[in-house]
Amino acid sequence: MQRNDCVCNDYKSLPRVFLFEPGGSSAEVLLYGGKVVSWKNSQGEELLFMSKKAAGRSPKGGISLCFPQLGNTGTMKEISSSKNNNVKSLDNIPLRLTPTGNPSSVDLTLKTTANNSNMWPRSFEFCLRVSLGPDKMTMSSHIKNTDSTSFSFTFALQNYLSVSDISEVRVEGLETLDFLNNLQQGKRSTEQPDAITFDGEVDRVYMRTPGNIAIIDHDKKRTIVIRNEGLPDAVLWTPWDNTAKAAVSGFCDKDYKTMLSVDSGVLEKPIILKPSEEWKGYQELSIISSSYCSGQLDPKTVAFYAKP
């Protein structure tokens, strides 16, 4: 039986764990920050985008965990994109591996105190479980306040998805929602009732999403469905041909053509935990072998197929 407690260092000399499930899906998770650097479906197709420019302990792409803060303060007025310099990512923080005995899941933990933490002067426990199912991957996050005082935080999972051609992709599930447009200094707007397509740079924070978002790739004839619990907000980002912004974010000039970032998070209203209180967030990514070319996606259909 394949084991997930075998740690290898062959991804840019970074320790990682391999996950497998009987249907053929696989994933690779770094011990630094619990970053997912590969997720393949049962046909062996890579579903996550990783930039060739990536280097060091923060390879760009995949799925990153951002905690305890996005933006300057976390208040709704000052929410900023998860792609700016104010992101507090866990990518450079080593997590403790707890073998599960199951080759399709892994548990990673981080326990800090206010005195020994370089990332945040608070005492807390963070637990992450990454699990694989048939053409499905789930990420469960658990944060407990072990400090003597209350603290607040925001949280996000940055999902860099591999697409065939960004101009041939559409996103459904964000129609008519309010969003903050970071290309217009955070101006609050309302999305149109149609599916979102791309012909230029996009950097938006959507509030109170319905829990199911579909990324439809016509050329690859597949749909990735993101289902969330406890992560009500979403960030939609593509630098398009803004080479300066792509470079600052750690991507190559042409990376935008085959990449789309659709993030899940708690951004509008930061989580407040009193001592001993806990918070949980859940994300499920699933694959449907269809591009829904016949028309606008029926949310009930997405909800049906996305459920475990």
Label every PLM stretch briefly.
Residues 146-149, 289:
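Short, acidic/polar linear motifs in exposed loop/turn regions
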Residues 30, 38-41, 149-156, 295-296:
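Short, hydrophobic/aromatic beta-strand segments
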Residues 103, 121-125, 132-138, 148, ...:
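Coil-to-beta-strand transition motifs
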Residues 27-29, 130, 137-145:
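Short, well-ordered beta-strand segments enriched in hydrophobic/aromatic residues
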Residues 22-83:
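Acidic-aromatic substrate-binding/catalytic surfaces of carbohydrate-active enzymes
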Residues 1-25, 32, 42, 111-115, ...:
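Beta-strand-rich recognition/accessory modules
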Residues 150-152, 160-235:
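Active-site/ligand-binding surface loops and adjacent short beta/alpha elements
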Residues 78-134:
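Extended, loop-rich substrate-binding clefts of extracytoplasmic carbohydrate-active enzymes
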